[in-house]
From Swiss-Prot:
GO cellular component: cytoplasmic stress granule; eukaryotic 43S preinitiation complex; eukaryotic 48S preinitiation complex; eukaryotic translation initiation factor 3 complex, eIF3e; eukaryotic translation initiation factor 3 complex, eIF3m; multi-eIF complex
Disordered as annotated region, ranges: 604-627, 809-828, 854-877
Origin organism lineage: Eukaryota, Fungi, Dikarya, Ascomycota, Saccharomycotina
Sample GO molecular function, one term: translation initiation factor activity
Organism: Meyerozyma guilliermondii (strain ATCC 6260 / CBS 566 / DSM 6381 / JCM 1539 / NBRC 10279 / NRRL Y-324)
Record's protein name: Eukaryotic translation initiation factor 3 subunit A
Amino acid sequence: MPPPHRNHNFRPENVLKRAEDLIAVDKREAALETLYEFITSKRIRYLQVEDLEPIALLLMELAVDLRKGKLAKDALHQYKKNVQMSENGLESVQVVVKRFVDLAEKKLNDAQAKADIKIDQDEDEDLETSQTPESILMSAVSNTDTADRTERELVTPWLRFLWEAFRAVLDILRNNSKTEVTYSTIVNQAFQFCFRFNRKAEFRRLCELLRAHIQTVTTQPKTAGTTNAIDLSDSETIQRYLDQRFSQLNISVKLELWQESFRSVDDVHTLITASKKTPKPVMMANYYENLARIFAVSDNGLFHAAAWNKFFNLYSQSPNATDDELSHYASILVLSTLSIPQRSSNSNETVVDDHRAKNAKLSSLLNLSHVPTRDSLLKSIVSRQILSFVDPCVKKLFDVLGENNFHPLTIKKEIAALFKEIEADKDYKHYIKTLTEVVSVRIFQQVSQVYETVKLDFLVSLGIFEGTEYTLSALEVENLIAIATKEGHLALTIDHESGVVTFKSSPFEDSLSDSLTSRLQISPAELVRSQLQKFAYTLSKTVDTIDPENARRLEASREAAVKRAVAGISEEQEEIANRVKVMDERKRVIDVAKRKQDEEAARLKSERLSAEQKAEQERMLAEQERRSLEKLEREKHLIREREKRKIAEEINAKGIIKIDLDNLENLDTDKLRIMQIEQLNKDKKNLEEKLRALSKKTDHTERAFRRYELQYLEKDAEAQIEQEAKNYELVKANKIAKAKKDFEEAHALKERFTRLVPDYSEFKSEINAKNKDKLKQLQAEAKAQLERAKQERIEQIKRERIEELAQRKREQIQAEQEEARRRQKEEELAKLKEEIRLQREKDAEMLKRRQNVEAEVASRKAAITPAAPAEAKPMTYAEKLKLKRQQAGRS
């Protein structure tokens, strides 16, 4: 590892000082580039985090001021990569990213305050979409005020910058247990950003980003080498993720992004299922309330009411619930339950074949074991006495729609009055539409039991509730009748020519009336349908009366069948057990095969991904190298052009020659310099010739001037001598007068002081007499103090000398020990070298003897038989060892 701070220019304090100096001279981009190069360098891995953090913070400030989002993102990634293995590296990263986001938010707030506008809530602009030429042209020719466009240009870039900052920071902090608290904080800030500025497109992208992060957490392999991995089994971690998803759900509902809200509900339910800890009741109540709103938007009345039912179960247990709130939510629960449309008897009320999976999914979101029904919800309301909390008008509506109090021809006015009263509350008002349709269909069903034919106008009038804010028109009522007939709630035909409605009832089909609808009377079709059942019952009673033994025979046969079943139950149980074993074995074999197949697929996928990543890395490295070379060539070319242009401008500025700055392609710096030098040499030669001629002319002129001025110089010298003599006499007289004056003043002062000398001497003697003892005492103390100081200094010098001698002795001993160890190592090394040399000599001698022996053996074999000589067989290790011992014995 290289020592830290080896290069003076690489020290953090020097880099920081350099950046501050550049900022002071208003070169912020240069300072940013300096800090960026330092932060992204791999050499900072060996520096202290405390030294790097101020540099990273200053870099973030400059990047935000200059709006360099991509540079800041890359710097943050590199900073995390370089310091994350340090002890406090990740804490420093969190401080830096928080500072980055805070600065971006502050800039956005300042820009918005400077623009002094409110962000247009209705304009859903995508922050990731850059301006197109068409949009620029449209903004230029539009009638929008120029000041408004300028103000928007101030705010929108900072909106985009802050959004990119959120994305970059979340990508840096994701999937790390040490940064999950800061990650959660940034997520909440991003949610508030989307809600504050109504950024629906960005909110969708943010939700997808968070889902990708949690998907990575759930699918990442749990290996021992994984550091700082997110543990979803930890209660605090799962609670943080739940808080994030609940915030996401609340914001999506407030932004009216219902599809995203449903996905958020699914995310919350997945986390709740994975969590070992039950969420807080307040959070679950909020969950069910938002789910009810989502179901209301999707027109799913059944699950809308079921969600309000789950919400009220939790809310009614809250100690903070007031009577008004309980009454409000209970009324909503009852109204939503009454608004559930009834289903016909020819379809399964709980599970519709086309929506089986959907209903099961929605039931699981509500934590229900089975699909709810209208009947079960009504029974729940009655059994839990929820009607005691509801508003009086809602309770009265529930009683009116009861099974025994529903009269189709007289109930219309009463229901209309209740609807008018319910419409006064804005939260109850939106249930009137579905209640109107449900009540109308039920009225039509009751009428179909009483009448066979009615007038169409009469039937339509039964579905129009006058006096309410929401009422159906005649065409809408007719459409409702057609839909009810299509769904199987009614069986009728409409003759528009005569305006007559005919109710149909086939005796060979199931009743089309809903099973929950009370019957006013039994229709002829019902009588025909039950005739066969009554006939069978009568025949059974007749047989029992004619032949009393028939019952006993049936009982005996039943007992015999039971005995046979009991006798064969053990064999059947054994067969079942064997079948279970076979099935388990088959299942185990299938599981093993599937697991092997999955492992093989995972291995192949991992290898493929590794190969793709390696190829991608190689491609990126090659691309990066190519771009670097191209950038270097461009920079070199640009530098050459700049230098060429600069030289040409200097030449033009000096006026040496005139060069066309727009036509420099065929010229390089060397040619320009040669042209400049040639022109300078030419100018120099011309100047020298001019100077030579001028100097020759100047010599003759100067000689004439000097001859003419000689007569005037002599006269001037005489006048100057006379003037200097006068000046000397004047200065001399002034000095003598001043000296006399000073002497007289000093003599007078001496006489004045002489009169004071006797008094001064007497006063001095008195003072000396008074302070004589004190002066002696002070002198003695000073002398004693001086002696003590001398003695202490002597002792200090002795101690320092002793310590110095001891230190020298220790250093000498240490040096001797080091020298001894060095000599010992040298001796051992020399000994080892000597042994190696001797061993090599022995090996050489052995090789020579072996060659002699082999030659002797070969000569003997050649003498015995003239056959072709065989190749020398290499000696084994045992033969070599034996030969070595023989040689050692001979020596």
